From Swiss-Prot:
SS bond list: none
Stretches with biased composition (Polar residues): 7-19
GO biological process: SCF-dependent proteasomal ubiquitin-dependent protein catabolic process
Species of origin: Homo sapiens (Human)
The protein's name: F-box only protein 48
CDD domains: F-box_FBXO48 (cd22113)
Length: 155
């Protein structure tokens, strides 16, 4: 019987050590993720100050940041409103279809960049298709090309 009690004591020490290691690990994780210590309103305020690129990078930091950023639709709305200046019809159509602000931004961000370049006349004097930069092209519908043609005719 005496041997069993020694063995149980050894198990208890190991169990206590394991709890200590777990507690230390949780403490380190909490220190590394100070956002979890802040009130949700403060965290949201900080994230709302980020530009699109920084917001996307922050969402890659950890699961809790990703969840917060991904599920806070109001973080994405101001960025959508900026894109809407160039892609009004597309944004309005997506809103009517019930997409979230985040999805609307994902669907239209790159298109808005390319469309803005076309509308601003960046490609007005292209001599051949070879002159077009391939990496910034984006498929656009007939209505968008119509807007671009109208802008070209007004120049």
């Amino acid at each position: 019987m005496h041997k069993n009690s020694k063995r149980n004591n050894n198990l208890r020490v190991s169990h206590t050590e394991a709890n200590s290691v777990d507690a230390e690990k949780e403490k380190n994780e909490s220190q590394n993720n100070f956002f979890e210590l802040l009130p949700a309103e403060i965290t949201f305020k900080i994230f709302s100050q980020l530009d699109i690129r920084s917001l996307c990078r922050a969402s890659l930091t950890c699961r809790s940041w990703n969840d917060t950023i991904r599920n806070s639709d109001s973080l994405w709305k101001p960025h959508c409103m900026t894109v809407r200046a160039v892609c009004r019809r597309e944004i309005d159509d997506d809103l009517e279809s019930g997409y979230s602000w985040r999805v609307i931004l994902l669907r239209n961000y790159q298109k808005s960049k390319v469309k803005h370049e076309w509308l601003s006349g960046r490609y007005s004097n292209i001599c051949s298709p070879i002159s077009l930069p391939e990496k910034i092209m984006y498929p656009m519908d007939a209505d968008t090309w119509g807007e671009i043609l109208e802008a070209e005719l007004e120049r």
